[in-house]
């Protein structure tokens, strides 16, 4: 099954305390951006990549794409919005007539083809599928610095990206959110409101989002582990 990809790289990464977009921070000699995008470029089912970035970084993205020898017809660069949801909407406007679209956070550099495979199976069966992992830690609801309750984690999942949807479904979800002025934290939260069932497929505990400086040493360790697995 072919798909188009909306690749989000417009975030400012303020929590990373970097002086630049965290996409351009290097992880073992290459920008996070490249690590996150490479698996999709290697996947022949990915027919088009729509990179959503800040306008002032468009030239830099083009240069990186040229270095990677990516065919021009396969890449389109669009300006991001003030919120994640608006950036996704901008990307969706540039999607073609394909059936399926994946949305991925560029700050997640450890996506694997296995996860993409599971998502494509999930979206074929359910029209909407997201990858996630079971919550491991005890979770508590807190108000004003005081624990209110311990949440039953049995049915709690940590949601990741990519997230996969039939293109008309995700477009409809964004139209509804815009009409009702709803701002969600991921695409699934919009699709759920249509309503449309969203299937869960197994993600990976390695598939972390790089958000704060503390994540970088962990990312280097994960990259080393994944490299070791690949070389076994």
UniProtKB/Swiss-Prot annotation:
What reaction gets catalysed by this protein?
2-C-methyl-D-erythritol 4-phosphate + CTP + H(+) = 4-CDP-2-C-methyl-D-erythritol + diphosphate
List the molecular function annotations (GO) for this entry: 2-C-methyl-D-erythritol 4-phosphate cytidylyltransferase activity
**At which residues is there a site annotated Transition state stabilizer?**
15, 22
EC id? 2.7.7.60
* Marked site positions, Positions MEP for the nucleophilic attack: 153, 209
Keywords per UniProt: Isoprene biosynthesis, Nucleotidyltransferase, Transferase
Q: Which pathway is recorded for this entry?
A: Isoprenoid biosynthesis; isopentenyl diphosphate biosynthesis via DXP pathway; isopentenyl diphosphate from 1-deoxy-D-xylulose 5-phosphate: step 2/6
Keyword set includes Lyase: no
Give the similarity note: Belongs to the IspD/TarI cytidylyltransferase family. IspD subfamily.
This chain's protein is named 2-C-methyl-D-erythritol 4-phosphate cytidylyltransferase
The scientific name of the source species is Listeria monocytogenes serovar 1/2a (strain ATCC BAA-679 / EGD-e)
